[in-house]
Every structure is written in C-alpha cells, then in structure tokens.
C-alpha cells in the first residue's frame, strides 16, 4: 500500500511540475490509493486463509501439530488486513509528506533494478522461450516428486535412544534380571552413551500392561561435541545392535517420545504394525508367522517381531470331587488354600509415618515354579489330618496365551517392525503388494495396517479430498477480485510454476514427502496466488495510466509501450 500511494504521488507531481499539492488533495490521493489497494488486500487475505483450509481439516496427530500454526497465521492475516485498511491510511496521512526521493536513490533498489531489469527485458523479448523453459522445468519436477519417498513426519532427533528388546513369554524373573544387567553393561561400554536406565515388566498400575518379557531401556547420549569423530546416531544404533545379539531376544530400536505417542495412539510400539484379526488365537499366530516370513527380505524392514499369542505358562489344577468328599473337604477349601499359596493372602499392615502399607504372604517363587512342590501344598482335612494337594487334585503346567488382546470385540495379533534406511511409504507399499499377492487369508480373518503408516494414509486422504475444493474456492475469489475469468486463471496458473523451486529443493535436499512438506507447499500456494494478485493489480493500474496518456487504440499504443 505504501508503494502504491508513493507511485500515485509521483505521478501527480510529474503531471503538475512545481505545483504544490494542498492538504485536501493529498488526503484525496491517499483515499483513492487505499480504495484501490484494499480490494487486493482483502482477496489476498481470503485466498491465503482458504489455502490453509486443508490444514484446519487435518485430524489426529497431524491436526494437533499443525492446527496452532494455521490458527496463528489466520489471526495474524485478519488483523493485518484490518490494520491495512484502517490504521495504515491514518499513519500515511501523518508521515508521508514532503518531497519524495526517487526509487533509485536507495542503493539496494539500484542494485535490484540493475539485476532485474535486464532479466525482465530478456524474458519479454524471448517470451516463448521463457514459457518453454518454465514448462520443461515443471515437467521435469513431476517425476522428481514422484520418485521421492513418503513418510508421516520427518524424524526428530530426541538426543536419546529407546531400546525395546522382547524375550520369550515364559522368561523367569531371574533370567530377565540377568539379561537386563548384561544389556546395560554392554550399552554403557559405548563411549557416546552417558546414562542407561532399563526396566523389565510393568509398573504396579492398572494402565501399564507390559509383560515381563518386554524390556524398556532408555539410553541418554552425551553431547555431540563429545562423540567420536565422524560417528552418527545411526552408527551408534548399528553398533549397539551388533553387540546386543543375545539368543532368544529380538531387538527393537526407537526413541522415547515417539514410542509413547505410537503406543498411545495406535497400540503399536514400532513404526509400523500389521494387526491380524480372527476367531482363534492359534490361527492368528500361524497367520502372523506367515506374514512375518513374507516381510523378512523386504529392504528397510528391521526389528521384525510377532506379538506372541501363545507361549505363556499356566498352572492347571483340576479338582477330583470324589476324593474331596472322601476327605471331608469342599471346593472352596481347596480354592482358598491355592489362592493364599500362589496369589498371596493379607497378613498384616505396617505404618511408616503417615503412610500405611498392607503386607501379603505367599510361597516363594522357586516353590511356585516347581510342580513337585505345588503337589505338596498342605490341606487340613477334618477326617484325615494334613494331606497334600495332589491327593484331591491333578496339577500340571499347560501352555496358553501370555496376553489376550482384542479390539472391537475381535481377537487380535500383531506383526510389528521398524523402518530404517528407507522411506516408510515405499517400504509399506512393497510389503502390502507382496502380502496381497502371496497370502490368502482364511474366511473370518483380516489384517489392518497400523502405526505411523495409519497416520500417513489418514493425512493423505484428507489432503487429496480437500485440495481440489480449495483450488475452486481460490479461483472464485480471484474471479470476484478481478471480475475477469482470464485474469483469475492467470493468477491461478502460476501455482504449479511456483512449486518448481520447492520440488527441486525437496529433491536435492534429500527430504521425503510428508505431512510437514505438504503443509509447506500449501503455504506456498497462498503466497504464489497473493503475489499474482498484487502483480495483476499493478499491471492493470499501469495499463490504465497508459490508456489515459495515449488512448485506447492500437495506433497509439505499441508493443514497446506495453513492455515498458
């Protein structure tokens, strides 16, 4: 707006040489310029806000991440538009007085004009060549974009590593403690590691369902200035993974924050998970193993692991009712004794300051894990005195599911894996194609892709659905701004050409396409259209001034005048 008003003042002074403009005429010029610019400002604001409509419609993690950006930008644009048409004219009336210096008096302007003028003259002289070069650059950028990988969000370096190995479901407390200590010692031997904190199993809360076989070790790294020369975080993970190859343990590598987000959002603790739904746990496990075998040779798939639905150990105690009646016992007598021996029974309370703790008593772990000792659990019979549990019950260890997982009332298993050294979109698409081609699912069984890939697909669907609608709204806004389909199309057609620079930058910088990159391109849409609106407004103004000077005729206006 400031530049627009300055140009109007300069034209008046050129037309009225040595004639002083009075205050009323100066205010009139400011008012006329503001009216001329306000329309472009309004529609530019509408267009930029409209271009961010896809961001407002994002859901899930991507919505929570980018909604603040979209709202902040929108509020700033609305306030800026209000200030441009209200406060700016008032300030201009106070401060834009006196003689105006020519634009070339500024050294920066002189430099820019010196660079820009020969370029624009060459482009106007060779118009077809200029258009052809841009079309070729646009056509080349399309396969470049198509060749880029896809991911949900660019990985963020948390300056820490989360090591999540999984052992066999029937691992004992003693063995898991030994494995945990060995792993911590090996991890601490790497020079870049500052601190190591590992845990096995779950906390004593109802919200933590981690089995004893799942280890979580947080590895805090030293500042990068203290790392060995030339080493990267990826190399540290590879070194640790090579050193931590323990039989019966499947390693898993991720980062603490993103892991918690994945687990809370999808229930999958890796980058990608294949949820297998069905009716029988044994069939689900067999199907999961078949899926795993198809994924083993796919590039980029790491830490491949099948969530166990079998392998848990259970104690089955089958009571013999005839023997119970012979000894004068009831089923409740046996159940209460077994419950106290294995599960524990309240014994007493202890008070420490203002806190009170209950104490339970049960058999030691070695006793509970021994079948012979379990058979000798004493029962008090009113007819025969003390008898062993084996006298009235058959006791045996049986295999079963360590954990039964279901979603929407359907039993579920899972095949989980992380993706490294390759983009998520290409890796998962190859896995989907291979599974669809080589695996026939039984009736009543189906699979569902989850994890970060689930977020990627959801974000893509929203963007692909709403972007065409946004382009239509932008075109209508341009039409109402210019009252011309040709000028509206002229402003809109600059969008794909504006993406050329972004496409080349993303490609040569080695960045995968993601929701974050898509939001960046959306912002570029609005800026490109806004620039087109401003240029069309100035071109129309310049043409109107030319018509006033030379008339609206081919005989009076030459091609050189139009170029000038």
Where are the regions that the model predicts?
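Hydrophobic, glycine/alanine-rich multi-pass transmembrane helices and their short helix-loop junctions
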Residues: 42-94, 452-456, 472-481, 498-525
């Amino acid at each position: 707006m400031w530049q627009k008003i300055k140009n109007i003042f300069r034209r008046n002074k050129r037309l009225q040489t040595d004639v002083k403009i009075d205050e009323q005429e100066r205010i009139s010029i400011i008012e006329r310029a503001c009216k001329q610019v306000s329309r472009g400002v309004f529609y530019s604001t509408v267009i930029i806000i409209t271009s961010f409509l896809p961001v407002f419609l994002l859901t899930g993690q991507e919505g929570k991440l980018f909604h603040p950006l979209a709202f902040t930008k929108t509020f700033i644009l609305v306030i800026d538009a209000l200030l441009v048409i209200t406060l700016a004219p008032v300030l201009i009336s106070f401060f834009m007085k006196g003689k105006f210096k020519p634009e070339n008096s500024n050294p920066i302007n002189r430099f820019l004009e010196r660079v820009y003028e020969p370029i624009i003259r060459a482009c106007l002289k060779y118009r077809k060549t200029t258009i052809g070069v841009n079309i070729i650059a646009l056509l080349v950028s399309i396969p470049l974009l198509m060749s880029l990988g896809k991911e949900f969000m660019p990985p963020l370096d948390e300056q820490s590593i989360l090591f999540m190995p999984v052992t066999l479901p029937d691992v004992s407390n003693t063995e898991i403690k030994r494995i945990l200590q060995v792993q911590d010692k090996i991890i601490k031997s790497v020079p870049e590691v500052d601190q190591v904190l590992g845990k096995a199993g779950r906390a004593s809360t109802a919200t933590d369902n981690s089995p004893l076989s799942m280890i979580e070790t947080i590895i805090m790294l030293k500042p990068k200035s203290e790392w060995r020369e030339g080493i990267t975080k990826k190399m540290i993970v590879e070194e640790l993974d090579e050193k931590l190859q323990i039989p019966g343990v499947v390693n898993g590598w991720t980062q603490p924050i993103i892991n918690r987000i994945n687990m809370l959002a999808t229930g999958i603790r890796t980058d990608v998970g294949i949820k297998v739904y069905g009716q029988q746990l044994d069939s689900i496990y067999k199907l999961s193993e078949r899926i795993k075998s198809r994924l083993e040779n796919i590039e980029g798939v790491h830490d491949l692991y099948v969530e166990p639905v079998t392998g848990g150990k259970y104690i089955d105690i089958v009571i013999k009712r005839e023997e119970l009646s012979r000894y004068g016992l009831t089923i409740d007598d046996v159940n209460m004794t077994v419950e106290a021996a294995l599960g524990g029974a309240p014994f007493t309370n202890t008070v420490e300051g203002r806190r009170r703790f209950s104490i339970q008593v049960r058999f030691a772990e070695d006793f509970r894990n021994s079948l012979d000792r379990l058979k000798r659990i004493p029962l008090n019979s009113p007819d025969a005195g003390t008898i062993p549990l084996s006298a009235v019950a058959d006791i045996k260890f049986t295999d079963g599911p360590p954990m039964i997982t279901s979603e929407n009332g359907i039993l579920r298993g899972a095949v989980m894996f992380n993706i490294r050294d390759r983009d998520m979109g290409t890796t998962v698409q190859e896995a989907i194609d291979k599974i669809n081609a080589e695996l026939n699912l039984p009736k009543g069984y189906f699979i569902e892709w989850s994890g970060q890939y689930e977020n990627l697909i959801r974000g893509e669907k929203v963007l692909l659905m709403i972007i065409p609608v946004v382009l239509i709204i932008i075109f209508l806004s341009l039409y109402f701004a210019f009252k011309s389909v040709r000028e509206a199309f002229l402003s809109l057609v600059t969008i794909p050409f504006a993406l050329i620079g972004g496409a080349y930058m993303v490609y040569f910088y080695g960045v995968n396409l993601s929701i974050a990159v898509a939001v960046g391109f959306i912002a570029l849409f609005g800026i490109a259209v806004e620039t087109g609106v401003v240029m069309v407004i100035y071109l129309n103004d310049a043409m109107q001034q030319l018509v006033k000077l030379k008339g609206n005729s081919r005989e009076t206006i030459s091609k050189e005048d139009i170029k000038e």
